[in-house]
Amino acid sequence: MKTKEQKAVLKKCRHRAEIPMTVAAIVLTVITVLLVILLVSSVGKDQKAAEILTEQLEYEQADIDFAVKCGKYLLIAIVIALFLKLVWELFKNAGIAMVNDVPFEEKYDPKLYKEYRKYCEKFGIQEPPKLLLATDKENLESTGITIKSERYLRMDLSSLDVASATEDDDVIRFEVLHDLAHIAYHHYHYALLIATVVARWIPVVKSIYNRIMCYSADRLAAELIGREECVTIFLRSYMQSAYESERREEYIKRLKDQKLTFAERISATLYNLTQDTPSYPDRIRALIKL
């Protein structure tokens, strides 16, 4: 159970577009389910409609029966497809994790694991998820997964490589905080809802929602370790050339002062609609504006 203080922090850091999109997704999902139920329930009444249609248009009864059966089978196929899509989304990430990930236990790094438990307490997560190191970075789509009621947290293995190269654990600290933020916000469940139903109607919705979730998680991580520290971690870990002391301030200043023309803004928007995560410059720019 989260305390009032924890709930206040979660509310403060959540992206303003996240709740409206989640509500819209739930409403659209409910409407979709109701429409399917109404269509399926109306199949039994099609026989009477078929008789009226036969009298008015003088169609062959066999043709009408065939059309009714086709409609019935089509509705059943739609229901089965939605169900299979839900099952696929539920088990896809779990399958990827079981095939590509390796467990990370307390004995490997007691200090990091102790901090991990401390962060879980700060987020109001009573039972810390088991840590997995994701070796397949391209499929690191969902950081929080559930397998047989066990919760897991997937961490990017390359983050350990960066931490080892820079001799600094800050990047791991941020990675853990960012991923725990996704769990604290229940992002996996909402993303599953959108991927199963809403994204079938509006394909770009999934990528937009994933980007919003990423911004929310960044904000929550920044709330705990500091905005400037997060910017530094981004620059040091993912944009090493921009992190060099003589370039850092210049780079941040360019991000703040960058002005896009109308055509450039349209091009950037269209590109972002196809991306599931924001670019690192976009994430840094969002943190700077906090």
Task: Describe every region a protein language model picked out.
Residues K107-P128, P203-L260:
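Short helix/loop segments within enzyme catalytic domains
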Residues D179-A195, G226-E229:
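Catalytic Zn2+-binding segment of zinc metalloproteases
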Residues L132, Y152-R154, E175:
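Soluble periplasmic/extracytoplasmic beta-strand elements of cell-envelope proteins
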Residues Y116, D170-H187, A217-D218:
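Active-site recognition of the HExxH zinc-binding catalytic motif
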Residues E141-D168:
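Active-site scaffold of zinc-dependent metalloenzymes
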Residues M1-K137, P203:
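Hydrophobic or amphipathic, alpha-helical segments that drive membrane association/targeting
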Residues M1-L10, E229-T232, E244-L290:
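C-terminal capping/extension segments of zinc metalloprotease domains
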Residues H186-C214:
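Post-HEXXH active-site segment of zinc metalloproteases
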